[in-house]
C-alpha cells in the first residue's frame, strides 16, 4: 500500500517537471520526436528526460515508439497539450494543490484549529499573510491560472450546469419572477437557466471585475430575448443583499469556501432581503456523505475536496447535519424544506424558505 502511495507522489513530481520544461508542447501533436531532439529543445539532459517520461508513461502520459528512441503523445498528454483549461488543471494541481497539501501539518503546528482565512496551509505554502483570493488578486497571471483551473473543474460532468437546471422545479417561479445568483461570477449559471426557463428574470451579483466581464460577454453574444432578462450587479456578499423580495436567491459553490462564522454572515445578509411570503433560497454545494454510505471511490473524491477547502480557506465541505446547524445559526426562521442530489451530480441542492414565526 505504501509503495502505491509513493508512486502517486512521483507521478505528481513528473507532471510538474514535464510542465515546467514545456514537454507537453515541445512534443509534436501528430508525430514522434527523438529523446535526443526533445532534450535539446527543452534544454535538459536526455537521460533525465527519458527517466521522467518513462515514469509518466506508466500513468498514460505520452508513449514510447517501439524503437526505444522516440516519444509521442498519448491521448491524455495530447489533451493536455491542446486544451488550455485541462493543462491549467494539471499545472495547478502540481504548483498549488500539492504544496498546499504538504503544508497542512505546518499550518496546524503554527495556528492549531484557527478558522482565520489567512492562517491556512495555503499561507504556509506561498509565504503570504493574505487570504486566498486576496493573494490571487495581487497578480494577474495567478488570477488567470485560477480562472482556467476553475473552468476545467466546472466542465466536469459531476458539476455540470445541467444538474442545476434539472434539479429544481424552476417552473414554480411565477412569470416575470426574479432569481438572484449571489456570487454568480460572469453569469454562466444564470445564462444556462435563462435559456431553459424563459419566464424568469435574473440578477447576477459578483465583484466589479467579474460583473464587467460578464456584462460585456453577454452583450456581445446573447440573443436579445435572453440578454433582456439578465442584469449584472456589483455586490460583495459579505454586505447586506440589495435586491429585496426576490422569488429566489442562489448560492452555488460559494459557502464551502467560507468557515462557519463567515458563512453564517453571508446567509444573514440574504435573509434580511427575503420575503417570507414568496422568497426561497437555494444552496448548491457538496453534502458530505456519511463514512461508508457511498462507494469508496466516490467518498475519496468528496474527502479530497473537504481537505482542499481546509487547506485553502480553513473552511470545509459539510455533512447534512452541519448544513442544518449552519442554516439555523443564520436565522432560526429559516426552514430546510428539501434536499436533492441530481443523478450524476457531486453536489446537492438545499431548498430553504423563511417562516413567519
Curated annotation (Swiss-Prot):
Q: Which family does it belong to?
A: Belongs to the class I-like SAM-binding methyltransferase superfamily. Cation-independent O-methyltransferase family.
List the GO biological process terms. methylation; secondary metabolite biosynthetic process
As recorded in Swiss-Prot or TrEMBL, the protein's gene is named pgmB
- Residues spanning the membrane: none
The organism sits in which domain of life? Answer: Eukaryota
Keywords from the UniProt entry: Methyltransferase, S-adenosyl-L-methionine, Transferase
Any idea what job this protein has?
O-methyltransferase; part of the gene cluster that mediates the biosynthesis of pleosporalin A, ascomycone A, as well as a third cryptic naphthoquinone derived pigment, all responsible for the coloration of conidia. The pathway begins with the biosynthesis of the cyclized heptaketide 3-acetonyl-1,6,8-trihydroxy-2-naphthaldehyde by the NR-PKS pgmA.
Listed GO molecular functions?
A: O-methyltransferase activity
* Native source species: Aspergillus terreus (strain NIH 2624 / FGSC A1156)
Please describe what happens when the gene is knocked out.
Abolished completely the production of the naphthoquinones derived pigments and leads to the accumulation of four new compounds which lack the O-methyl group, including 6-O-demethyl-5-deoxyanhydrofusarubin and 6-O-demethyl-5-deoxyfusarubin.
Q: What induces it?
A: Expression is significantly up-regulated at the end of late growth phase, in the presence of Butyrolactone I. Expression is positively regulated by the pgm cluster-specific transcription factor pgmR.
Q: Which InterPro entries match?
A: COMT-like, O_MeTrfase_dom, SAM-dependent_MTases_sf, WH-like_DNA-bd_sf, WH_DNA-bd_sf
Pfam families documented for this protein: Methyltransf_2
Catalytic site positions: 256
Q: What is this protein called?
A: O-methyltransferase pgmB
Q: In which pathway does it act?
A: Pigment biosynthesis; Secondary metabolite biosynthesis
Binding residues annotated for S-adenosyl-L-methionine, in chain numbering:
206
